[in-house]
Amino acid sequence: MLGAKASDIPWNNDRRKNMLFNVYGDNAIYQWAAMLLVLVGLILLNEVARRTKVGGLIIFGAVPAVLTVYFIVVAVAARMGVEWAVNNQTHIYMNGWFHYAKLYAALTGCIGFMMIKYEWGIGKKHWFKAFPFAIVAINILIAVASDFESAINGWYSWWLSSEGVWLYGGWHNVFNGIAGILNIFCMTGWWAVYSSKDKKDMIWPDMIWVYIIVYDIWNFAYTYNCLPTHSWFCGVALLLAPTIAALIWNKGGWIMNRANTLCIWCMFAQVFPLFQETFHDGTTFYPWATITTQYADGTVSGIVAGTSANANPTAMTIVSLMALIVNIIALTYIIVKSVKNKKNPYTGEVFTNFKYYQAAKDRAVVK
């Protein structure tokens, strides 16, 4: 075994099959360091955005305005055949409908949540309290559509997305798509949304750790299924950042944390996709680029559209089934408790007897 490559060692191959990501070998230190750097960066930028009005306006006002002009210029120039635009990394790797839809849906959420937090304009109106539910549901449906798209385009076979990523469809997409739809109805207390007493957060008291966990499992499964070359960052670091904040120091503010960090990450990834990209020929621009174990041999080389060679859907199936099961359990609990208490879970609240709910409600200005 002396001098053998990591991929040549039998126990290393077995370990690969039992892991979610290919995070071992020569690049492991870069992969873990980059993921932790993204995690810390998202937490810090979220704190800047939520704690200061100026920070929020810059991050979710000025920066997106500049980037929107940039995206339009790139798209128009690329269509005209201008060389710099045709070869621009945003145009090459992030030109699919999903990434733009996710970015601007998240941005819409951030702006709407700030309106509620600071009581700007319609943010003071009672009917607008249902906006957080609506925008989160839209974001979830965007991902659900992407899951079903993958199942349709490659039923237990490889297909190449418009961003040049090899995806493998199947029942895992169906399971997780259904889980996403159920997850929408796991959101309760739609109109019980408030500004925090310190004006740093929008508080949704009934969105406690129960929803946070089932959402995170579902969304992780989505990124694992449909963003396999990005999931190490957008399925691990991006989900951990708002959850850590909401469980430790920002109780009740998870959904605002989530929107903020999602929008920040989407803007960064749209401009610098090469940061995390693994190309369809198996090469990477940076050593920390990480892929999932759906690529059986740890590479994406030699994959052919319409075939199943080099595919390992086991982990995708397990995490997608887990997402479906936990969302069924959560929704069942909500229904049973609502029937028992004779209360509508959407116009009323469900988790009022939980400590997390009480801690969140104590932070809110309830009018």
Residue ranges and their predicted role:
Residues 20-119:
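An N-terminal, globular interaction/scaffold subdomain
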Residues 26-38, 92-110, 132, 143, ...:
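Alpha-helical transmembrane segments of polytopic membrane proteins
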Residues 39-44, 234-366:
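C-terminal transmembrane-bundle signature of multipass membrane proteins
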Residues 55-62, 125-134, 259-263:
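Cytoplasmic-side transmembrane-helix entry/capping segments in multi-pass membrane proteins
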Residues 63-83, 110-116, 133-150, 209-225, ...:
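Hydrophobic alpha-helical transmembrane segments and adjacent interfacial helices
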